[in-house]
């Protein structure tokens, strides 16, 4: 059946994309065509075919295509008071906030909401004492590579730097996963009702 053939090819996808061996002879475009054909013939439903298409395109996407730009960042200055940071967490709904030194172009760490409130409860008053290291990347890094780096380092966020070393934005593990599986709703996302 078309679905069986497609899933056989699906299992071979990583080697097809990264090694393009002569004997295989299947391009990404041909694989997408097979997915479309399987969907049209009823072998795949719309969601399955979308997931497969996203997986095929996943290796081509760059961090610059998924980042949150610097103008939309919620970040705290390293010398911010605990009350100011608590307000940022409450107003933004984010679980991690980048910490910068003097300017947003100098992000020096990230603080997790859970760690922040635990430290605040213990009486900690210095934000720089509870920040975690942050990872840096460039906009032309493939998101599949950034995902491996974040997973290897058990991190959820990377600062995307521009060609001058300034902050272009941030990319999160959630941003990467959403490119593969679609939007992930959480309790802080705005609900939009369609009529």
Where are the regions a protein language model picked out?
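Soluble cytosolic regulatory domains appended to membrane proteins
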Residues: 19-195
């Amino acid at each position: 059946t078309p679905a069986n053939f497609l899933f056989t090819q699906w299992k071979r996808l990583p080697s097809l994309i990264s090694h393009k061996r002569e004997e295989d002879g299947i391009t990404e475009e041909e694989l997408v065509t097979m997915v479309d054909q399987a969907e049209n013939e009823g072998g795949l439903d719309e969601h399955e075919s979308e997931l497969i298409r996203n997986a095929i395109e996943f290796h081509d996407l760059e961090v610059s295509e998924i980042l949150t730009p610097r103008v939309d960042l919620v970040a705290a200055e390293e010398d911010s008071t605990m009350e100011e940071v608590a307000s940022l967490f409450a107003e933004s709904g984010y679980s991690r906030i980048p910490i910068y030194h003097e300017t947003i172009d100098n992000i020096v760490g990230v603080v997790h909401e859970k760690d922040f409130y635990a430290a605040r409860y213990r009486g900690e008053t210095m934000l720089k004492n509870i920040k975690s290291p942050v990872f840096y990347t460039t906009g032309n890094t493939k998101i599949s590579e950034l995902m491996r780096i974040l997973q290897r380092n058990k991190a959820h966020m990377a600062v995307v730097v521009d060609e001058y070393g300034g902050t272009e934005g941030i990319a999160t593990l959630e941003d990467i996963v959403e490119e593969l599986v679609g939007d992930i709703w959480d309790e802080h996302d705005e609900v939009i009702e369609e009529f």
